[in-house]
Amino acid sequence: MDFSFSSEQTLLQDSVERFIQNDYGFDQRQKLTGSELGFSKEHWSHFAELGWLGLPFAEEDGGFGGSAIDTMIVMEAFGKGLVVEPYVSTVLMAGSALAHAGTTAQKESHLAAIIGGEAQASLAYIEPQARFNLNHVVTRAVPDGSDWVINGFKGVVLGAPSADLLIVSARTDGDEQAEEGITLFVVPANAEGVSRRNYPTIDGFRASEVTLSLSLIHI
């Protein structure tokens, strides 16, 4: 059994490691973590130009149809450089949720913007009472005509300070610990009724506590 990389994967590895070596020295990273934004928009645009933001997504969704090994190559190099750009929160968490659960219209709009580097997104799913039980969702969404009204709180939403979109888990049926009845909603981060308390994490990333109060979401 051959575990060596393909020629394309070797080129990808060389490309990402070259970026880390040339553009992500310790002093450069320190400047980024100390900035107001916490990362570099120029780096993010560079990721889009090189196709890294579209790497794990299917070709029919505008991505490059990369494998888990391709993503591992990028993440291994990012780990070496302690990269603080919100790749995990936007691409691997929120982006994957959109790719697997989003409608065709949501993919064409939001996923395309993520792949192009034009938008960032965060997956808002952690609630303080849940501990590690992902079924324990108190945030609730109730229908209002063709809209949904969402009320609740999400903690440690990685990448949320810079996010344009929040992928929010909310209960639409059942009691607060039921396995069924949880729905994901695409919520504009600047929507009325959405507030964020932003803070830096110990490893240099940014996160938010997100409160949704009578947030009206059109579906």
Question: Where would I find each of the regions flagged by the language model?
Answer:
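A short, Trp-centered hydrophobic/proline-enriched beta-strand micro-motif
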Residues: G117-I126
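Internal helix-loop-helix
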Residues: E49-E108, A112-G117, G159-L165
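Buried hydrophobic positions in well-ordered alpha/beta secondary-structure cores of metabolic enzymes
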Residues: Q9, I20, G51, A58, ...
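Short secondary-structure junction/hinge motifs that connect adjacent elements
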Residues: D27-L50
